[in-house]
């Protein structure tokens, strides 16, 4: 039986792609850059917002200075609009409630910046107690570096073999492998099944409810 389930946020618990896309496009437009269709952002997100901005900027403009300029426009806009169109994926709220009632610890490990991670989790899952809600924190490497998982394990006081890590991207599968914990790839998120399969996770699922069987 697993004692702790760690979930990625964007593309796993919440479909946030529209709000991320609209906010990035707002920032790009403010600075005179070309914007992108929402669907293209599926392959830009996942490695933190600075990497998102670098990918969104046109060739020849991908400098650190320009990334920071986009970030300056993005943050205040996204902080207001990050829950406009974002929604939990089907079955997620019921799954979290089930795990909580069964006494399983629940945590979030995201590459989204910390303030937005906390806000979205509190907004969409107010009835759920999370052992940890960690986003991108200053001085801590982003996923697939396993530090975020190790920090959660310390708070939860569990062993690696007692953990299931659930995510929708290759970054998540690599994070689980780097941390030495069991991985479950979910196919309803931003990345295709083929990307998940490259990392040979212990589990893959198309339906949130099936995660219950991986816990017990």
Please report, for each region that a protein language model flagged, where it lies by residue.
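Active-site neighborhood of HAD-like aspartate-dependent phosphohydrolases
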Residues: 1-43
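Asp-based, Mg2+/Mn2+-dependent phosphohydrolase catalytic module
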Residues: 1-3, 114, 118-216
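Generic enzyme active-site microenvironment
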Residues: 6-8, 109, 166
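An amphipathic alpha-helix signature
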Residues: 21, 25, 42, 46-54, ...
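Helix-loop "lid/cap" segments that line or gate small-molecule binding pockets
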Residues: 27-28, 48-63, 120, 152-153
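Metal-dependent phosphoesterase signature
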Residues: 55-94, 102
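Substrate-recognition element of Asp-dependent hydrolases with the DxDx(T/V) motif
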Residues: 92-122
